Amino acid sequence: MARIGVENSLTDVQQALQQQGHEVVTLNSEQDAQGCDCCVVTGQDSNVMGIADTSIKGSVITAHGLTTDEICQQVESRT
């Protein structure tokens, strides 16, 4: 399964992705995003960790306004 970086305040998303079998990495700094297939951020501050300027392999999903299920669906479609 995919390696997904998830901002630490999104614990429900972390748990749901782990239940689906993904490797979940908590994003505390820009370095945590390296090696991730996809990252999920809150969107409250679109560049809180510099991810917008970082060239990670995968896409960045903004969780703002989405349910946990919708976020998981986006992760599945992008990995």
UniProtKB/Swiss-Prot annotation:
One matching Pfam family: UPF0180
InterPro entries according to UniProt: UPF0180
Transmembrane segments: none
HAMAP family: UPF0180
NCBIfam families given in the database record: PRK03094.1
Family that this chain belongs to: Belongs to the UPF0180 family.
Protein name: UPF0180 protein BCB4264_A1446
Organism of origin: Bacillus cereus (strain B4264)
